[in-house]
Amino acid sequence: MARAKLPRSPSEGKAGPGDTPAGSAAPEEPHGLSPLLPTRGGGSVGSDVGQRLHVEDFSLDSSLSQVQVEFYVNENTFKERLKLFFIKNQRSSLRIRLFNFSLKLLTCLLYIVRVLLDNPDQGIGCWGCTKYNYTFNGSSSEFHWAPILWVERKMALWVIQVIVATISFLETMLLIYLSYKGNIWEQIFHVSFVLEMINTLPFIITVFWPPLRNLFIPVFLNCWLAKHALENMINDFHRAILRTQSAMFNQVLILFCTLLCLVFTGTCGIQHLERAGGNLNLLTSFYFCIVTFSTVGFGDVTPKIWPSQLLVVILICVTLVVLPLQFEELVYLWMERQKSGGNYSRHRARTEKHVVLCVSSLKIDLLMDFLNEFYAHPRLQDYYVVILCPSEMDVQVRRVLQIPLWSQRVIYLQGSALKDQDLMRAKMDNGEACFILSSRNEVDRTAADHQTILRAWAVKDFAPNCPLYVQILKPENKFHVKFADHVVCEEECKYAMLALNCICPATSTLITLLVHTSRGQEGQESPEQWQRMYGRCSGNEVYHIRMGDSKFFREYEGKSFTYAAFHAHKKYGVCLIGLKREENKSILLNPGPRHILAASDTCFYINITKEENSAFIFKQEEKQKRRGLAGQALYEGPSRLPVHSIIASMGTVAMDLQNTDCRPSQGGSGGGGGKLTLPTENGSGSRRPSIAPVLELADSSALLPCDLLSDQSEDEVTPSDDEGLSVVEYVKGYPPNSPYIGSSPTLCHLLPVKAPFCCLRLDKGCKHNSYEDAKAYGFKNKLIIVSAETAGNGLYNFIVPLRAYYRSRRELNPIVLLLDNKPDHHFLEAICCFPMVYYMEGSVDNLDSLLQCGIIYADNLVVVDKESTMSAEEDYMADAKTIVNVQTMFRLFPSLSITTELTHPSNMRFMQFRAKDSYSLALSKLEKQERENGSNLAFMFRLPFAAGRVFSISMLDTLLYQSFVKDYMITITRLLLGLDTTPGSGYLCAMKVTEDDLWIRTYGRLFQKLCSSSAEIPIGIYRTECHVFSSEPHDLRAQSQISVNMEDCEDTREAKGPWGTRAASGGGSTHGRHGGSADPVEHPLLRRKSLQWARKLSRKSSKQAGKAPMTTDWITQQRLSLYRRSERQELSELVKNRMKHLGLPTTGYEDVANLTASDVMNRVNLGYLQDEMNDHHQNTLSYVLINPPPDTRLEPNDIVYLIRSDPLAHVTSSSQSRKSSCSNKLSSCNPETRDETQL
């Protein structure tokens, strides 16, 4: 119903407002208002308004007050109804076309029946006329047309053909009428209409002229009409089922029907024309057509008269024109389908399992990383990977996907995740998971994130039940995809990992090896022990199991977490790192000895393989004891053990579990309290040092005498190391200004009052202070310099882990941000609350900028990959500038530890490229061999990566892929990196082993020592070794080398203060555990070991000196050495001159020529080490051992990775009692060691 305003009639205009026209009915409602209008009432004013409205706008006749309007009346006509039924309606038109197709096939079948029933020998003539016989004379070229014009047609067959022709004719005329658009001639001269008239109109004429009933009518041409009807029917069918991707199917169908119609037309045409010639039957004509179309013909069957010969020529010409066009169209569609990838069928999606990978552009490195990591898990072998990418597949990807290993399991679809049609093609709603990756090589990374966000929204809208795994680049965009099941923010993880690299060396290597799937078989065929041990330990990964179902941990139910961790490692070689309560979703790393294990707990542990795939071989205790004694007498090294023995034979370590107290040595005033102090046994040195047992239940009196909450009070009573500097007050709290939404709150060391923005500038003084260089600040710890292009929000995550509350105040290193562009106020507002954080504008390729930011006073320099150089015209050239700049810095500052981020992991080989170094060439061959063996970690033996000096964020892509099987990996990684802080969860730190700590002997005894004294869980070792390499171009087996400890090469120079040439202890928690050295007389074992190392080194040196005669090669080496020394002196003078020019003091600069073994260790990244130490080409290498076997020998300068329990874990339960007990113990605690763990 609708209302319309009608003009007033003349009578209505004359009538008064209260009058009613004659003959009109009284209105049903007052004032004639529609019931749809709101009523107005309540007072005279409302009534007057209502009447005025009625008089002006609704003064209608009561009979016309409501008007019913009908819509789409144009479709109610007879023609429109017919058009709707025959053409517009999908289902009805499909039925009509199916009927028409069947009708055409029936006419062709009736023609074949007429040919089979026809017998020319019975006579030829019109219906009702006299018949005569005709015989063809093969010797004469003349023939009669009568056998061609007249055929024999039975009466019943004629009736059926007439009826079918009449129906077809009427249908054709009706469709012509319905589809008429103003041009009748275009429809009349259409090929389909002409064929219809040829095949139907003669039959209708024979009804009115009987003699023509035997007239030949080429009914077999209806096959082409049937083909046309079939095409229309398939189109209607696809439209009815809403199938849009049907072009390929249609083209194949058209090609097949065209071939069939050509053969059928040729067969029937030649058979009929040869009635006047050789009188061929249908089968012979069909054989002739097939032979003629497929070959040049055999000549056994040939047409006899010229009309049939002419027909053959015409058919061949048509075939040569039509078929190539059809094939061209088919090939084009096939190529397009190869590009787009076709469809993933619904049947496969329901019967098979598949995951979808959505990317902006697919590169070969990204593809292989995903496939290798995804299919590394045994239970994913039956999964299919459907790649949905808007760009065309490049040549390298196409070549890889043609390999049988991947072609059977990977399907590439070209399409957009924003289109529901493409998501339907990928069957996203049936997928097991959807991985959405950002394009990190884009110049505008924010735009790349925006595309990722839209893809995630589109997938969530289309398939809300499909698990989402999203990779995001910028941390400020993370909250847009918070709904995803798993999210990895690239910049968050990158900056946090680079920060931990400065205080826990090679954290990047540790995390990378943990998140890669490996069986620990890399390097096992290498002749070098470090490669075998490093490769085997790289197979350790994080696994989980319910404690009640575990053979590893079931026996420790009701015991403390620390007790279970130690004994599981001792017995099975597994490292228990954390757990999760059944009623709590939070994962806790090392919850401490107060945590009692329950059967419902989920345990997370590090091992070569998961427990379900492990076999247990239990041996008799006597054999274990004997083997343990033999292991003490002769150390064969962990590399002698097979891979499975790490699990099967972990109970072979002899541990002295006597219940003795561990007391710090009372030697020097610096005291030993911060290291693994050697306990004394009543003054007797005959007994082997013992370690206290790990208690089943925590003893509160024996645990951490002072937690880190007392750090504030410690600082108040601790005298300053430098009397000229005042003690700066820090507070613990949460940063007040987060630079982006979604950052995890972390308790940090903060300034009591925010620093003014002017004070954050390192190289410029202000009204608050006049410092203009790092020397003037007088920092006690070495600097950490970060070189970045812009101060993005991700850089905030570099600062937070280094200022976390669990870091000791005395271990905080000053942080200098060397930025190409000036930071905005929003970023400065976020960092102004942190202590000792400064910025400076400059570039890493400018020597003046490096000197002004205090690079000569820095221990660590982090070079972050620049966004503007992440994309290059030539692949893998994006890192060229970064690599060259880092090379230059290593030449200028050899003692500096530089961590470099690269865009492409394959470029890390240039970080230590030496063309004539045989050892580097051998490592390159080893990498190629591992890659051929299918290893996911082929790059692991590159020395810069093994040492943790180079990192690429693409290495962490596997973290997202591994989360499909291990949904806890992202959470554990963020806890290790300090990005998330869960109450009660521990944190990652490091401890350095010195010669005074070697009484521990083995890693298993160290595990017990740490668990019993400070409840810390070691998870690995960072080891640095000195090697002497031969310069001869032999392989690794022929290389002459020795392995000694760094302490044998170290200069015995004393510490010269914070800016001295060599400090006794470096900055950061890495070196925070060792203090002054104890008397070597107390350690005869250490003296003997040092003498053995010295003799081995001297013997090796004397052998090489004796084998080096005065030859031309030796003279060349000497000249080269002199040349390099002069080069180093030149570089040293260059740096000093620039410092003088800038007005910087040169007293802190260390001469490049005076290299020590520590310098060599720090320069393992780049390899300018040949001929720099001595004539024996000494070099160093560093590597990470994850969860080594308990009988692994400790070496000096080993750095042990620890998971330390949260010092705030139990504060809420007994805060008052802890506060009083800590205050009572402050006087008894050594003030220099309170922040470290008492061991």
Swiss-Prot record:
It is found in: Cell membrane. Changing M335A: Shows channel activity even in the absence of cytosolic Na(+). InterPro entries: K_chnl_BK_asu, K_chnl_dom, K_chnl_Slo-like, RCK_N. GO terms for cellular component: plasma membrane; postsynaptic density membrane. Residues 1-93, 179-192, 234-246, 339-1239 are cytoplasmic. Homotetramer; which constitutes the Na(+)-activated K(+) channel. Interacts with KCNT2; these heterodimer channels differ from the homomers in their unitary conductance, kinetic behavior, subcellular localization, and response to activation of protein kinase C. Interacts (via C-terminus) with FMR1; this interaction alters gating properties of KCNT1. Interacts with CRBN via its cytoplasmic C-terminus. Sodium-activated K(+) channel. Acts as an important mediator of neuronal membrane excitability. Contributes to the delayed outward currents. Regulates neuronal bursting in sensory neurons. Contributes to synaptic development and plasticity. The cytoplasmic N-terminal domain facilitates the localization of heteromeric KCNT1/KCNT2 channels to the plasma membrane. The cytoplasmic gating ring domain of the closed KCNT1 channel harbors multiple K(+) and Zn(2+) sites, which stabilize the channel in the closed conformation. Under low-Na(+) conditions, the abundant cytoplasmic K(+) ions stabilize the gating ring domain in a closed conformation. The open KCNT1 structure contains at least two Na(+)-sensitive sites in the RCKs domain where Na(+) binding induces expansion and rotation of the gating ring that opens the inner gate. This is Potassium channel subfamily T member 1. It comes from Rattus norvegicus.
